């Protein structure tokens, strides 16, 4: 499970969205989408923080090479979940949001039933394929025959994971974020506690035993969470039979086919990319252990830190899908343009703050978290990429909410194919530098294509001068933070953080980048109006 409704003063909304529940807790007064995003963000940051501590523990227990093997196993699991869902989670979110926006709970139930049935078929078939192919994948791709047991665990639990993902889409679509958050928090914390128990009680120091403990801990707790979500949905939709005449199967197919094609291509190419990295690093002159250590350093240690603050944007991206779907169903073009403007502007400020902060703090963060210099150096190199990575998360959510799944298929195909070709050609010759170059180029191209399509669909004209001012504020605040020096790790880290935050806020106000209307809107959004 996982990821702004603007104030009425700025953009009126249909009175339907202000209904208060009188039965089953279904019709609820909707808070701002930004407020819901902040709620999800706070929870996700807490859970990501706990997970990062757990990741540090794993890296010290099994080493960077062991973390690399664990990342490859989880890559296979992610690919299996993608094929098992086949676009049904986003389709469920989109269709439930449309039916909820028209106040048709029988339509919501019909949408959920169709998506669950289709997801069950896809996940069972995918799980069976993974179950029977586990030994071949472990030998050929993972180069670790003992990892086949981990893959079999993943295969058996796949239908359950996909069911939980589809059920969670209902709560996001209907604006019931708090209920989803409660279940998510309990499930994630229970998962970490159970995993730690399994690690300490039964698992040794081998990566395969560690991976099995991680998978089993998540499976048991996700089963309980799935049951809890199912019970809540049954209570909400009690007395509402699936409605006929809505052509729900056709509508679902129209969404799932392009979504599944996009996800298949993206996941397939991403999986190939992930397996190409250790292969290319070995061809560049390193041993298998050294290649897995470099891969684990980037994928399991640096990238989680780089994307840690993105919890807000992924939550916002998830919430934008149903919000824009409702606005599009109502024909409210003005609200779509307003959301586009606010999301792009606030997203750029947030991404700029994170990029500048990471650039100024990277070496000390690497030492503070992992006690190593290499993660900090890689983090500083990648920090400018935060701008395109974070903004792409917002743009992707808006495109899905506007029904632009086919465009997402096209852009993902182009950029992922570029990624694989660049890695295949450059990685054996230039090693990790080639991977960093490929990562930067393909993500920039994807963001540029997606943004171009979003602007064409919404009719929004971006303010280039605003973007330039925001980037200059980021650079100025980062430069100011470099003036802090000291003898110890934590004094420098805390001093640079404080000076960067003060400088960034001051420059935003001084240059007029953060306008009074923005602060008023943020204040009202924080209150949830």
Question: Each PLM stretch: what is its role?
Answer:
Residues 47, 55, 86-93, 153-172, ...:
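Short runs within selected transmembrane alpha-helices of multi-pass transporters and secretion channels
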Residues 36-51, 217-225, 229-233, 246-322:
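Transmembrane helical elements of multi-pass membrane transporters/channels
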Residues 17-18, 22, 483-529:
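Membrane-proximal transmembrane or re-entrant/amphipathic helices at the cytosolic face
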Residues 86-101, 306-331:
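Helix-loop junctions and terminal segments of transmembrane helices
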Residues 32-93, 127, 131, 157, ...:
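Signature of the first transmembrane helix
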Residues 2-50, 106-110, 244-266, 518-529:
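N-terminal membrane topogenesis motif
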Residues 119, 123-268:
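Hydrophobic transmembrane helix module of multi-pass membrane transport proteins
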Residues 134-154, 358-389:
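Interfacial segments at transmembrane-helix termini and the short loops linking adjacent helices
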